[in-house]
Protein backbone atom coordinates (compact mmCIF):
# COMPACT_ATOMS: atom_id res chain seq x y z
CA UNK A 1 0.00 0.00 0.00
CA UNK A 2 1.37 3.44 -0.94
CA UNK A 3 0.39 6.70 0.72
CA UNK A 4 0.39 9.65 -1.66
CA UNK A 5 0.64 13.30 -0.68
CA UNK A 6 2.49 12.79 2.58
CA UNK A 7 4.94 15.55 3.38
CA UNK A 8 7.54 15.93 6.07
CA UNK A 9 9.47 18.85 7.46
CA UNK A 10 13.19 18.45 7.98
CA UNK A 11 15.25 20.99 9.91
CA UNK A 12 18.22 22.40 7.99
CA UNK A 13 21.51 23.78 9.31
CA UNK A 14 21.88 27.45 10.16
CA UNK A 15 24.14 27.90 7.14
CA UNK A 16 21.58 26.38 4.78
CA UNK A 17 18.81 28.42 6.41
CA UNK A 18 20.74 31.64 5.73
CA UNK A 19 21.37 30.51 2.15
CA UNK A 20 17.62 29.93 1.68
CA UNK A 21 16.84 33.30 3.23
CA UNK A 22 19.32 34.96 0.90
CA UNK A 23 17.54 33.41 -2.11
CA UNK A 24 14.18 34.95 -1.15
CA UNK A 25 13.24 38.56 -1.80
CA UNK A 26 10.26 38.99 0.47
CA UNK A 27 8.95 37.83 3.79
CA UNK A 28 7.30 39.08 6.96
CA UNK A 29 8.55 41.20 9.83
CA UNK A 30 7.07 40.01 13.13
CA UNK A 31 6.88 41.96 16.39
CA UNK A 32 4.57 42.41 19.37
CA UNK A 33 2.60 45.60 19.91
CA UNK A 34 0.11 46.04 22.76
CA UNK A 35 0.50 42.36 23.58
CA UNK A 36 -0.63 41.35 20.07
CA UNK A 37 1.52 39.85 17.32
CA UNK A 38 1.95 42.13 14.31
CA UNK A 39 3.06 40.84 10.91
CA UNK A 40 4.09 43.21 8.15
CA UNK A 41 5.04 42.28 4.59
CA UNK A 42 8.64 43.15 3.86
CA UNK A 43 11.50 42.85 1.42
CA UNK A 44 15.03 42.14 2.54
CA UNK A 45 18.64 41.67 1.66
CA UNK A 46 21.27 39.76 3.62
CA UNK A 47 24.46 41.84 3.80
CA UNK A 48 27.58 40.94 5.80
CA UNK A 49 25.56 38.60 8.00
CA UNK A 50 22.97 41.29 8.76
CA UNK A 51 19.40 41.28 7.52
CA UNK A 52 18.25 44.65 6.15
CA UNK A 53 14.46 44.80 5.95
CA UNK A 54 12.18 47.38 4.31
CA UNK A 55 8.66 47.25 5.66
CA UNK A 56 5.49 49.37 5.76
CA UNK A 57 5.56 49.99 9.51
CA UNK A 58 6.10 53.11 11.57
CA UNK A 59 9.67 53.54 12.75
CA UNK A 60 8.42 54.49 16.21
CA UNK A 61 6.71 51.11 16.55
CA UNK A 62 9.95 49.32 15.70
CA UNK A 63 12.58 51.49 17.38
CA UNK A 64 11.34 50.54 20.86
CA UNK A 65 11.93 46.85 20.12
CA UNK A 66 15.25 45.38 21.16
CA UNK A 67 14.67 42.22 19.11
CA UNK A 68 12.74 41.53 15.92
CA UNK A 69 11.83 38.38 14.02
CA UNK A 70 11.79 37.95 10.25
CA UNK A 71 10.22 35.02 8.44
CA UNK A 72 10.43 34.08 4.77
CA UNK A 73 9.33 31.02 2.87
CA UNK A 74 8.84 29.52 -0.54
CA UNK A 75 6.16 26.85 -0.70
CA UNK A 76 4.98 24.95 -3.77
CA UNK A 77 1.58 23.74 -2.64
CA UNK A 78 0.90 21.52 -5.65
CA UNK A 79 4.26 19.80 -5.41
CA UNK A 80 4.34 19.62 -1.64
CA UNK A 81 7.83 21.09 -1.44
CA UNK A 82 9.41 24.25 -0.14
CA UNK A 83 11.09 25.79 2.85
CA UNK A 84 10.59 28.26 5.68
CA UNK A 85 13.18 30.25 7.64
CA UNK A 86 12.83 32.37 10.77
CA UNK A 87 15.57 34.74 11.95
CA UNK A 88 15.49 36.56 15.29
CA UNK A 89 17.92 38.98 16.82
CA UNK A 90 18.74 42.47 18.03
CA UNK A 91 17.56 45.15 15.64
CA UNK A 92 17.78 48.85 15.00
CA UNK A 93 16.03 51.27 12.68
CA UNK A 94 18.40 52.55 9.98
CA UNK A 95 18.57 56.31 10.45
CA UNK A 96 21.74 57.25 8.55
CA UNK A 97 20.44 59.23 5.52
CA UNK A 98 23.02 57.87 3.05
CA UNK A 99 22.54 54.26 4.11
CA UNK A 100 18.75 54.64 4.08
CA UNK A 101 18.86 56.20 0.60
CA UNK A 102 20.96 53.29 -0.66
CA UNK A 103 18.50 50.67 0.61
CA UNK A 104 15.48 52.63 -0.61
CA UNK A 105 17.02 52.56 -4.09
CA UNK A 106 17.84 48.85 -3.99
CA UNK A 107 14.88 47.39 -2.04
CA UNK A 108 11.42 47.95 -3.54
CA UNK A 109 8.84 49.30 -1.10
CA UNK A 110 5.07 49.33 -0.84
CA UNK A 111 4.61 52.45 1.27
CA UNK A 112 6.30 55.81 1.45
CA UNK A 113 6.55 58.40 4.18
CA UNK A 114 6.15 57.52 7.86
CA UNK A 115 5.16 53.92 7.07
CA UNK A 116 8.33 53.17 5.10
CA UNK A 117 10.91 51.87 7.53
CA UNK A 118 14.30 50.22 7.17
CA UNK A 119 15.59 48.02 9.97
CA UNK A 120 18.76 46.01 10.44
CA UNK A 121 18.45 42.69 12.24
CA UNK A 122 21.53 40.94 13.62
CA UNK A 123 20.33 37.31 13.43
CA UNK A 124 21.24 35.36 16.54
CA UNK A 125 18.74 32.56 16.11
CA UNK A 126 18.12 31.20 12.61
CA UNK A 127 15.84 28.21 12.19
CA UNK A 128 14.96 26.67 8.85
CA UNK A 129 12.94 23.74 7.59
CA UNK A 130 12.52 22.10 4.21
CA UNK A 131 9.19 20.60 3.26
CA UNK A 132 9.50 17.49 1.11
CA UNK A 133 7.46 14.55 0.02
CA UNK A 134 7.81 11.66 2.41
CA UNK A 135 8.99 8.40 0.94
CA UNK A 136 6.22 6.00 0.04
CA UNK A 137 4.84 4.06 2.95
CA UNK A 138 4.33 0.35 2.34
Task: Outline where the language-model segments fall.
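Short, surface-exposed beta-strand-loop junctions and turns on beta-sheet-rich folds
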Residues: 35, 59-61, 135
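General beta-strand recognition
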Residues: 50-52, 120, 127
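Short helix/loop capping segments that flank catalytic or ligand/cofactor-binding pockets
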Residues: 129-131
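Extreme N-terminal tail/first-helix region
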Residues: 1-21
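Short, structured beta-strand-loop surface elements
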Residues: 56-117, 123
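Short beta-strand segments
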Residues: 24-56
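A short, compositionally biased
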Residues: 22-26, 64-65
